[in-house]
Amino acid sequence: MVPYRPEHVERYHEWMQSPDLLEATGSEPLSLKEEYEMQQSWRDDPSKCTFIVLAKEKCDMGATMENLDSQEDNDFVNRNLDAMVGDVNLFLSEQDSEDVSDEQEGFSTTDENENEKMQAEVDIMIAERWGQRKGIGKEATSLMIQYATSHLNIARFFCKINEDNTPSRNMFQKSLGFIQCDYAECFRQYEYELRRTSGDSVETLLGSRVIESFQCRVSPQLES
């Protein structure tokens, strides 16, 4: 996975011409100019983590990814535009006080773990049909949860899925261990969540669902 950059916008815009993808993601169609503006806005927003998922079988890793986010080296990005298969996002917010579990109330409030009452909405899209039903969405989502647990100290993950999107519902429930916490009848939309308590490791959170070898991996820039 790599940060969402301007070079990715045209392909992303092509994806979002699909009525099915617009409906599944709850998105509105944008012009190409608006898509570029949205990319810049999301990149500058500290409450959003947005990454493009690359399929390993189509990815030319080259010598290094260390300069992936540098203006001096765009070669990796341009070389792998055809490996783009989808995107994964985290939208960060603070939990409402009534939504914080008893276990989370016991969290320390020091600066080091001030995010322990934060939550993240998870949004995953595998846009290319050739990349679907291969487990890439599960792996990308697991990787983002592992990163957010280890580095952002997120206490609650949740997602909202249309009731007729059975593959996504099965992935979050059966493959990732999310549980249903709400249903909005007016939107015909389920909400699922995965909570952690103080001290939970990612292994405890995801159990056997932790993936040791990913088809897609995170750019080192995630940790910068």
Predicted feature locations:
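Cytosolic beta-strand hydrophobic patch enriched in CBS
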Residues: 50-56
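Conserved GNAT-fold acetyl-CoA-binding loop/helix
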Residues: 19-41, 55
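Soluble sensory domains of the PAS superfamily and closely related sensory modules
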Residues: 44-45
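Helix-loop element at the rim of GNAT/NAT acetyltransferase active sites that forms part
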Residues: 3-29
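Acyl-donor (CoA/ACP) binding surface of acyl/acetyltransferases
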Residues: 2-4, 8, 15, 61, ...
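Amphipathic alpha-helical interaction segments
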Residues: 20-23, 50, 200, 222
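Charged/polar, solvent-exposed surface patches and flexible loops
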Residues: 14, 23, 37, 41, ...
